[in-house]
């Protein structure tokens, strides 16, 4: 039996799981699911090669849930993921698949969460743990997590964990697991380091390779925008700049559908939310309004939008980036129908660049970046639309009835020129969307590769003084990874944001040098960051984060004695330890070397 005529019932899965799948809308297994489930349900090891978006989460979650012991309240299933976003996604999938199974508890463990909350959740006895290597290793060392009863281990996106430098931590964790467990390893590629792990820890694994069937959509113009500032403000700008018949905005959660819809309604857009909490009758009414033009914008989750087919949709906005490429293809496929052209826009946070690369790789395309629509352009657009509305009223038959009201609008019976009166009425009529759009107040800190400008002692080229005079709310830190280590800005931003629970929007300029890098972070973190990142590694190298200068420094950095120690490629940190400097009559003690007895990984 091929996967095209199989159902999930064909695998002999627990009836409660089948019921949950039916509720979600899962009918037919994907190729990776059809290939993996029969082996995993029998307790066999599986080595799977499949692209992100192939449905591999269900491929391992469903058979492992089938074999779980509901009456045993200890960790039985462990899933390792490279990022906290993926950990949350996988944990949610387990919860959705097991919602009809009484007594199943799922817990996601990742950096950035408070330990006390995680300990409280661990004491409740979750059977399924999903987490990132660094935080899981911390719990193992603290003896707050026991894997002695584990029977199933999953390494999800193993090649990504290798690229991010987590493989040593993964191997350490695997040595803590009983030999009798089964292992499922999934990876888009199969480098030698991953092969070595499979040979060392897996028992005669069944190797399964699934080719991606994701195709490009030449009829859809695709672009992405790197997020900075408030996403809702940016969303309004993109909607105003685009001529569309109907738009669908994809978000990740039910709450987000309501929040975004509320914002759009406030700005005068005819929009509605579509989520899993809606009953079938209300859902059908909403879709009917979208089809006949009574509704222009729909804010939906992936699950709620299943089966959505409306020819009017000409614009798709991925407000929250999907976690896999298949979901992205399904989303943008809502436009460009019936021979029409369509447009798709993707909002990408700095920490989500990896997901963008996965989408581009799976679709074999390069998605172009766009800028936020400019203020002058938006002002022009708003004025044009407002002028159209004014013209409609000028052509109305009852306009003469309102002419008689004009004299009554003049305050205190004073004479008022008609232009001032019209301007006042215009200001009142503009509503939430001002006809005069203010210039952008948020300047995007672009995370670009910057050449090592310290060569030939050209210190002034970095202009630290002007930078810090501009922004008093950031401190400058140094980390011990640079271009010679193969590091890129995305690696640094991802690690800092992921482990430090720092929004990527709050990360300032990142500068790459030969043997180290500098990064701007919000002011006031210098006492906590060394402990937070004590074991953090990027590309398998400890970052050893150190405070260089804080925003309270008043002097001219170019006047500091021996500043070449910072600026030359031959950084002599030993000489700089606890050294005192004098600048503008103010003595500053700058500690540049932080002793790290323990280390911590993302």
From Swiss-Prot:
Query: Per its UniProt entry, which superkingdom is the organism in?
Result: Bacteria
**What InterPro entries is this protein classified in?**
CsdA_RRM, DbpA/CsdA_RNA-bd_dom, DEAD/DEAH_box_helicase_dom, DEAD_box_RNA_helicases, DEAD_helicase_DeaD, Helicase_ATP-bd, Helicase_C-like, Nucleotide-bd_a/b_plait_sf
Where does the UniProt entry say this protein principally localizes? cytoplasm
Locate the residues binding ATP.
50-57
Say which family it is in: Belongs to the DEAD box helicase family. DeaD/CsdA subfamily.
What is the residue range of the motif Q motif?
6-34
EC number of this enzyme: 3.6.4.13
**What is the gene called?**
deaD
A Gene Ontology biological process term: cellular response to cold
| Domain annotation Helicase ATP-binding: ranges | 37-208
Q: Where is the Helicase C-terminal domain?
A: 231-378
Answer whether the UniProt record assigns the keyword rRNA processing to this protein.
Answer: no
Principal EC category? hydrolase
Q: What is this protein called?
A: ATP-dependent RNA helicase DeaD
Q: Which GO terms describe its cellular component?
A: cytosol; ribosome
One Pfam family per UniProt: DeaD_dimer
Supply the alphabetized keyword list. ATP-binding, Cytoplasm, Helicase, Hydrolase, Nucleotide-binding, RNA-binding, Stress response
């Amino acid at each position: 039996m091929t996967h095209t005529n199989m159902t999930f019932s064909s695998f002999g899965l627990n009836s409660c799981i089948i019921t949950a799948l039916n509720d979600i809308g899962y009918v037919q297994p994907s190729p990776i699911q059809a290939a993996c489930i029969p082996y995993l349900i029998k307790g066999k090891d599986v080595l799977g090669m499949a692209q992100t978006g192939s449905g591999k989460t269900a491929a391992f979650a469903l058979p492992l849930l089938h074999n779980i012991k509901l009456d045993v309240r200890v960790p039985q299933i462990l899933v390792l993921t490279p990022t906290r976003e993926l950990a949350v996604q996988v944990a949610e999938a387990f919860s959705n698949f097991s919602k009809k199974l009484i007594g199943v508890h799922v817990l996601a463990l990742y950096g950035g969460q408070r330990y006390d909350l995680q300990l409280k959740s661990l004491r409740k006895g979750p059977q399924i743990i999903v987490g990132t290597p660094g935080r899981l290793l911390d719990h193992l060392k603290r003896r707050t997590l026991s894997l002695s009863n584990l029977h199933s281990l999953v390494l999800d996106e193993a090649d990504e964990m290798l690229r991010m430098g987590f493989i040593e931590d993964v191997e350490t964790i695997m040595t803590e697991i009983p030999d009798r467990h089964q292992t499922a390893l999934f990876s888009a590629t199969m480098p030698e380091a991953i092969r070595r792990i499979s040979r060392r820890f897996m028992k005669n694994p069944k190797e399964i390779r699934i080719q991606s069937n994701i195709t490009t959509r030449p009829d859809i113009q695709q672009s992405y925008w790197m997020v900075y500032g408030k996403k809702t403000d940016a969303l309004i700008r993109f909607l105003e700049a685009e001529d569309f018949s109907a738009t669908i905005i994809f978000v990740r959660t039910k709450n987000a559908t309501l929040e975004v819809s509320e914002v759009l309604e406030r700005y005068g857009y005819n929009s509605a939310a579509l989520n899993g909490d809606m009953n079938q009758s209300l859902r059908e009414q909403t879709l009917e309004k979208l089809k006949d033009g009574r509704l222009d914008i729909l804010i939906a989750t992936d699950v709620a939008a299943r089966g959505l087919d409306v020819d009017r949709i000409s614009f798709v906005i991925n407000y929250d980036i999907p976690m896999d490429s298949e979901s992205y293809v399904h989303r943008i496929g809502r436009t460009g129908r019936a021979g029409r052209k369509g447009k798709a826009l993707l909002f990408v946070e700095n920490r989500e660049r990896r997901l963008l690369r996965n989408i581009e790789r799976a679709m074999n395309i390069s998605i172009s970046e766009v800028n936020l629509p400019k203020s002058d352009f938006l002002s022009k657009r708003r004025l044009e639309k407002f002028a159209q509305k004014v013209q409609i009223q000028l052509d109305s038959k009852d306009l003469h009835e309102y002419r008689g009201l004009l004299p009554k609008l003049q305050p205190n019976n004073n004479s008022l020129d008609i232009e001032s009166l019209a301007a006042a009425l215009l200001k009142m009529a503009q509503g939430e969307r001002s006809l005069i759009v203010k210039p952008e107040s948020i300047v995007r800190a672009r995370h670009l590769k910057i050449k090592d400008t310290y060569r030939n002692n050209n210190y002034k080229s970095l202009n630290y003084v002007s930078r810090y005079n501009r922004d008093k709310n950031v401190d400058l830190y140094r980390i011990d990874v640079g271009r010679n280590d193969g590091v890129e800005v995305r690696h640094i931003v991802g690690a800092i944001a992921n482990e430090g629970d720092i929004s990527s929007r709050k990360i300032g300029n990142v500068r790459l040098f030969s043997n180290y890098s500098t990064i701007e972070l919000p002011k006031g973190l210098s006492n906590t960051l060394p402990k937070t990142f004590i074991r953090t590694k990027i590309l398998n190298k400890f970052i050893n984060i150190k405070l260089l200068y804080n925003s309270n420094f008043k002097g001219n950095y170019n006047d500091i004695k021996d500043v070449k120690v910072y600026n030359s490629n031959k950084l002599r940190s030993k000489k700089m330890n606890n050294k005192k400097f004098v600048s503008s009559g103010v003595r500053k003690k700058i500690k540049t070397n932080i002793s790290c007895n323990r280390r911590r990984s993302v």
